[in-house]
UniProtKB/Swiss-Prot annotation:
Zinc found in the keyword field: no
Keywords, in A-Z order: Antibiotic resistance, Folate biosynthesis, Magnesium, Metal-binding, Plasmid, Transferase, Transposable element
Similarity remark: Belongs to the DHPS family.
Subunit structure: Homodimer or homotrimer.
Protein name, entry field: Dihydropteroate synthase type-1
Gene3D superfamilies: Dihydropteroate synthase-like
Keyword Magnesium part of the UniProt annotation: yes
GO molecular function ontology, one term from the record: metal ion binding
InterPro entries assigned to the protein according to its UniProt record, in alphabetical order: DHP_synth-like, DHP_synth_dom, Dihydropteroate_synth-like_sf, Pterin-binding_dom
Length: 279
């Protein structure tokens, strides 16, 4: 069963306008609606991470997420905080969120004791840049991508496990779009080889492709028109081993998953009936 992460950005400069919720009341309303229409988890981003994003201090990140965490205090297990800043992460841990999502993949060992004492799940993301936000200068070649991603995760998972973090708390995100390369071919190669990654790593995978640059480069459309391409990529990811999908359109994805699962049941039933006919 796939877990759907709905994207909620508490920023002024996220690359997809419709994901932005700047006022606390609007953010709470949007989060509740996401949970209603199909999100299992709301992934809350207090700072953008695309190449043109402006820096946000930990104090401002905390100021942005605090009202939402107050409002969702009885559903903290369904909240993820998307931040790579240790101060924000420690605050989120103290509030009892269900997930921490780090685009740098938790590089700071000083945070590990706090993580080990908590029980939230960790989305450990790979990026070619290794630190900071996505850039247009990193360039991971398609033919090198899988080996590089596996090497990164083997080292990072080992470090987290040695610090006392249980393996069943770890979720791995290979990174997509500018986090891999400005060239769409790298993301397409990784997306088409999810099964290989999952077999090599042996841990759950999260895939986040929603409205990303490589989709636009592939189909020749702007961000605002990438809903159908995003859904197609997300369904491909689910069919090829993704356990978690992070999306701007959780309601659409949930409907598509429901239909796909229903169709699979009918296909299985029909195959079983044909077997009985030939018995």
């Amino acid at each position: 069963m796939v877990t759907v992460f709905g994207i909620l950005n508490l920023t002024e400069d996220s690359f997809f306008d419709e994901s932005r919720r700047l006022d606390p009341a609007g953010a709470v309303t949007a989060a509740i609606e996401m949970l209603r229409v199909g999100s299992d988890v709301v992934d809350v981003g207090p700072a953008a991470s695309h190449p043109d994003a402006r820096p946000v201090s930990p104090a401002d990140e905390i100021r942005r997420i605090a009202p939402l965490l107050d409002a969702l205090s009885d559903q903290m297990h369904r909240v993820s905080i998307d931040s790579f800043q240790p101060e924000t992460q420690r605050y989120a841990l103290k509030r009892g969120v269900g997930y921490l999502n780090d685009i740098q993949g938790f590089p700071d060992p000083a945070l590990y004791p706090d993580i080990a004492e908590a029980d939230c799940r960790l989305v450990v993301m790979h990026s070619a840049q290794r630190d900071g936000i996505a850039t247009r200068t990193g360039h991971l070649r398609p033919e090198d991508a899988l080996d590089e991603i596996v090497r990164f995760f083997e080292a990072r998972v080992s470090a987290l496990r040695r610090s006392g973090v249980a393996a069943d708390r770890l979720i791995l995100d290979p990174g997509m779009g500018f986090f891999l390369s400005p060239a769409p071919e790298t993301s397409l190669h990784v997306l088409s080889n999810l099964q290989k990654l999952k077999s090599a790593l042996g841990l759950p995978l999260l895939v986040s492709v929603s409205r990303k640059s490589f989709l636009g480069a592939t189909v020749g459309l702007p961000v605002k028109d990438l809903g159908p391409a995003s859904l197609a990529a997300e369904l491909h990811a689910i069919g090829n081993g993704a356990d978690y999908v992070r999306t701007h359109a959780p309601g659409d994805l949930r409907s598509a998953i429901t239909f796909s699962e229903t169709l699979a049941k009918f296909r299985s039933r029909d195959a079983r009936d044909r077997g009985l006919d030939h018995a």
